[in-house]
Amino acid sequence: MKQSKMLIPTLREMPSDAQVISHALMVRAGYVRQVSAGIYAYLPLAHRTIEKFKTIMRQEFDKIGAVEMLAPALLTADLWRESGRYETYGEDLYKLKNRDKSDFILGPTHEETFTTLVRDAVKSYKQLPLNLYQIQSKYRDEKRPRNGLLRTREFIMKDGYSFHQSYDDLDVTYDAYRQAYEAIFTRAGLDFKGIIGDGGAMGGKDSQEFMAITPDRTNLDRWLVLDKSIPSLADIPEEVLEEIKAELASWLVSGEDTIAYSSESSYAANLEMATSEYKPSSKVTALDDLVEIETPNCKTIDEVAAFLDITEHQVIKTLLFMADHEPVLALLVGNDQINAVKLKNHLGADFLEPASEEEAHTILGAGFGSLGPVHLTDGIRIVADRKIQDLANAVAGANKDGYHLTGVNPNRDFQAEYADIREVKEGETSPDGHGVLQFARGIEIGHIFKLGTRYSDSMAANILDENGRAVPIVMGCYGIGVSRILSAVIEQHARLFVSKTPKGDYRYAWGINFPKELAPFDVHLITVNVKDQEAQDLTEKVEASLMAKGYDVLTDDRNERVGSKFSDSDLIGLPIRVTIGKKAAEGIVEIKIKATGDSIEVHADSLIETLDILTKDN
């Protein structure tokens, strides 16, 4: 493919509105362009990368018996009313009317559509299991689109749905999808973790998220690609390294989720779902009497602890929530933070939000900072974190502004449900007892769910079982954010290319090192002087030999300065660069492997053999 015939609008500078490096590079390197807020055009390079990823997906899904189809993106609102999600999905749902004033939506996901199709076609257990998927644009009316393809209003998604007679059968397909996802993301060259996830608005029972890990900005070895003029990182002057560190730090860390994972085992979970090892305390302490004391101007845990000369751990943090419009008290030890997702899941609530201070006064008679679990009126549900039951003679709010109670003891002074509702902390022991928890930022690239009968119940999707009884179909749901993959890959494979000029000056510039399986082309063939006939003849010979061996070749045939060509090549990020320069008359070409920065001159007749050797481990 001739570069002069492609739309690759590279930029000399980073776009000023980009905050994460993946967004900046995909715009600067000519992969995408924003059409309007949260809506992007995928230019030829991005389209080729996405199509390569689709090919990987299709190959792996063929192995597990998943069948591709295509459903409409424009959906009747009646289906979503039937499932109940038309009212509950929220403001992200695009709602519209046709000329007859009938209600429609633009699909953000397709559980209802697939459930209806199967409900109308499948009547017997003998027709199951079914494993269907599609690759399609989805729509969500994001309030604040940001970070390039990571948070958009239109996006490409692979969504799959499986239909079963039993949960045992669902488990088999769920595990097959888990293995297929691992194979897909591994082939795509991604550093990822499969983690315990939250089902959120999708509904369902079990779920697993797949997160692309955002690289550590402090590890220079993984960010820098050194030119052959620089033997090692140690040869770069300290002041230059400080400039490079500042450049790395200037970009926001991408990834909307924090992942907690074990340093020694396979345990990994979204921070919203993560837990740590809990060992109940067995110490015996004489129980003090309850005493009400004045605590003037003490609104926070640390202020109360300082006033009473105790540790924050001895103070019970009391938070008031409204769960489906009913009050719930959540209790934590003072130096812990609430995990609202865990609390919501424990309660089985559809909606959970912190109460207002006005609601606190109405329900408990006091404002924030003075709330507590003692002497409550009937009907207020109390959920305490597991660690609360280890406390003795603790301090809690007296439900009277400016006052607290000392000598508070669980089970004697209040009754509560105990559950893990706290946010874990880095360095705590992993729940499996192996290693400690470490945190990383991650980009969600895939999610699989055991939906169970969530949709078949509400939409009457039943089959006749072996005994002729009508039973609901058991479902699974499996998503991959296809357009997000481009962001995740660039985030992980962005590099700073460092070189040294003949005068001894150090230069560094951003570029991409695409993994081979997703690179839009395999080889970037650059002719330094397109007006040199010998160079042109050699270019055509090399291009033909590469293509004959199955390489996808992007040939830079533009009449541009060589520096501009090399700069664009670094930005575009193809794995191999072959340059035809001053030694074209001798048949000599230069090979450069982008991932390492290594380069070598060879005769054109030996090019294919040399590439086979240089890339055999890649």
Curated annotation (Swiss-Prot):
CDD domains, per the entry: ProRS-INS, ProRS_anticodon_short
Entries under Pfam families matching the protein: HGTP_anticodon, tRNA-synt_2b, tRNA_edit
Reaction it catalyzes: tRNA(Pro) + L-proline + ATP = L-prolyl-tRNA(Pro) + AMP + diphosphate
Domain of life of the source: Bacteria
Enzyme Commission code(s) on record: 6.1.1.15
Function: Catalyzes the attachment of proline to tRNA(Pro) in a two-step reaction: proline is first activated by ATP to form Pro-AMP and then transferred to the acceptor end of tRNA(Pro). As ProRS can inadvertently accommodate and process non-cognate amino acids such as alanine and cysteine, to avoid such errors it has two additional distinct editing activities against alanine. One activity is designated as 'pretransfer' editing and involves the tRNA(Pro)-independent hydrolysis of activated Ala-AMP.
Entries under NCBIfam families matching the protein: PRK09194.1, proS_fam_II
Membership in a protein family: Belongs to the class-II aminoacyl-tRNA synthetase family. ProS type 1 subfamily.
Protein name: Proline--tRNA ligase
Organism the protein comes from: Streptococcus equi subsp. zooepidemicus (strain H70)
